[in-house]
Amino acid sequence: MKEKIVLAYSGGLDTSVAVKWLIDKGYDVVAVCLDVGEGKDLDVVYSKALDMGAVECHIIDATKEFSDDFVSYAIKGNLMYENSYPLVSALSRPLIAKKLVEIAEQTNSVGIAHGCTGKGNDQVRFEVAIKALNPNLKAFAPVREWGWSREEEIDYAIKHNIPVGINHDSPYSIDQNLWGRANECGILEDPYAAPPKDAYDLTAELEDTPDTPDEIILSFKNGVPVQLNHQDYDLDQLILTLNELAGKHGIGRIDHVENRLAGIKSREIYETPGAEVILKAHKALETLTLTKDVAHFKPVIEKQFAEQTYNGLWFSPLTDSLKLFIDSTQQYVEGDVRIKLFKGNAIVNGRKSLYTLYDEKLATYTKEDAFNQSAAVGFIDIYGLPTQVNAYLHGGYSNE
């Protein structure tokens, strides 16, 4: 009896070529494809995997689990790698790894294969997550073992009649889920080259966007959006709805050169219309509900959490601790945020909360002012005392 290997199967170039390669190596291939909200035709993926020779193909709808258990933390934690990338692909990898391990254990497979190259982030994310969940499973990386270029993979696919939907003229590598879309390769590898129109799919060109804005209200509870325009939504459906609504206004385009885990720089094109709207709204609400010290310290945790996620360390003691901190800050992040969507911009123009720490009577400069301005004298004396003592000792700072 042949040994079984579970393959993370997307139906794209790398994993389609990997099916044939693993079969030629003498393994039975168990293909696994997760739906995490990318809008892919899963019936086609299922049939394609079996046509390629896989002995089984498991299609798993994980969209809700992805949104509730992973994307929710990206929202509560305002997660952005290098202040630019909202972790579109990185967020889905631990969930995919989790499901791969579950299928491997159910089918008595000896290991798990993926279609990642030897210089990308995903090889690390998958293999570290798999070892964290089941250290006895072997990892197989056919594309890394070949060391082939993308052109050589395409040639191999053409030679063996493997349908992959791309060619030498359009060699994009695309990854998509409900949190956004990532695109690389081809002309995008030149960081000075303007992305062609066909590099985008979720967002409209600015010249094609409506000349009338849309104004929406997002309602949050415990740091997560639960309503759009006062209508209840599950998180996954709310994100998908915002992707369409914000996308038509050209919102969410990111052209970013990022520092990969493997030490190289990579130019990536991201489209994250729903994510941009939600994250802006969430940050706006936090300005009302977080105390000053929490608001100033939380970004330190957010940065570490984003790097943990990007670097494939979701299943780790540190990440568990970071999640606990983030959750502890979100108890009172509840309220409404009003946002205008127009010409590539998501503009926050109002926010309110029952738990607001903003006191208009303390903030106002009108006669309704309740702030005790005379208290400022003593505060300034005490606050500035170290500076004053230093000046007495050293003669003060020169104006020169």
From Swiss-Prot:
Which GO MF term does the entry hold, naming one? ATP binding
Q: Which domain of life is it from?
A: Bacteria
Q: Report the gene name.
A: argG
Q: Which InterPro entries match?
A: Arginosuc_syn_C (IPR048268), Arginosuc_syn_N (IPR048267), Arginosuc_synth (IPR001518), Arginosuc_synth_CS (IPR018223), Arginosuc_synth_type_1_subfam (IPR023434), AS_cat/multimer_dom_body (IPR024074), Rossmann-like_a/b/a_fold (IPR014729)
Which NCBIfam families does the UniProt entry name for this protein?
Answer: argG (TIGR00032), PRK00509.1 (NF001770)
State the name under which the record lists this protein. Answer: Argininosuccinate synthase
Q: Which residues bind L-citrulline per the record?
A: 85, 121, 125, 173, 258, 270
Family statement: Belongs to the argininosuccinate synthase family. Type 1 subfamily.
Quickly give the catalysed reaction: L-citrulline + L-aspartate + ATP = 2-(N(omega)-L-arginino)succinate + AMP + diphosphate + H(+)
Localisation per UniProt entry: Cytoplasm
Q: How does it assemble?
A: Homotetramer.
Pfam families in the cross-refs: Arginosuc_syn_C, Arginosuc_synth
Q: In which pathway does it act?
A: Amino-acid biosynthesis; L-arginine biosynthesis; L-arginine from L-ornithine and carbamoyl phosphate: step 2/3
Where L-aspartate binds, per the record, is at 117, 121-122
Write down the EC number: 6.3.4.5
Cross-referenced PROSITE patterns = ARGININOSUCCIN_SYN_1, ARGININOSUCCIN_SYN_2
Sorted alphabetically, the Gene Ontology cellular component annotations on this record are: cytoplasm
Gene Ontology biological process:
argininosuccinate metabolic process; L-arginine biosynthetic process; urea cycle
Which controlled-vocabulary keywords does the entry list?
Amino-acid biosynthesis, Arginine biosynthesis, ATP-binding, Cytoplasm, Ligase, Nucleotide-binding
Quote the record's binding site residues for ATP. Answer: 8-16, 115
